[in-house]
A protein has these predicted regions:
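Long, basic/Gly/Ser/Thr-rich N-terminal segments
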Residues: 1-4
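Phosphate-binding loop of NTP-binding sites
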Residues: 10-169
Length: 169
């Protein structure tokens, strides 16, 4: 109950601080809390992270279908939807990675269904804001990097640095 109020207070204070402070002071603790609440289900799954400016959804979907066709127990979390077992779950993410609570809930559901592989589409915003923390992908895929999202990242170097976080985890 108190967690809800603390998160609400932090959300209200966000505009007062630079993005890097928000990322480490708000997003990272939120990701740690979500992982703790859901029992860090990602540690029991083989995560394949896919990032890039363009082609993330297509590449993630192709990897998902390759593994599924090979008979592997696989799930997919993309900006379009999540595929868990025989279900397509509308996520409402559409253009970005899920918030840590939604992601951890999906991963716990996948773990409970004995899924082994999860193909996870990851955006630069999601990486910068620790949305997938503490997940450590076994495989990381980069489709490409072009001059996009500079409204958020401000410089191309900062954008590249955000994308590379997937490979450092």
């Amino acid at each position: 109950l108190y967690v809800k109020y603390i998160l609400r207070l932090l959300h209200l204070l966000r505009p007062l601080f630079p993005q890097v402070v928000v990322n480490y002071g708000y997003h990272l603790p939120k990701a740690i809390l979500a992982s703790w609440i859901y029992g860090n289900p990602g540690r029991d799954l083989e995560i394949i992270g896919v990032t890039g400016t363009d082609g993330k959804t297509t590449t993630s979907t192709m990897i998902y279908h390759i593994l599924k066709t090979a008979g592997k127990k696989v799930a997919l979390i993309s900006t379009v939807d999540a595929k868990v077992g025989r279900k397509n779950i509308k996520t409402g993410f559409h253009v970005t990675s899920p918030n840590p609570f939604a992601l951890q809930a999906l991963l716990r559901r996948m773990r409970s269904q004995k899924i082994r592989y999860v193909v996870l589409e990851v955006t630069s915003h999601g990486l910068d804001q620790f949305r997938i923390y503490p997940i450590k992908p076994k495989i990381a895929v980069l489709t490409n990097i072009t001059h996009e999202h500079l409204d958020y990242h401000h410089t191309f170097k900062a954008y590249q640095t955000a994308k590379l976080k997937l490979f450092k985890s």
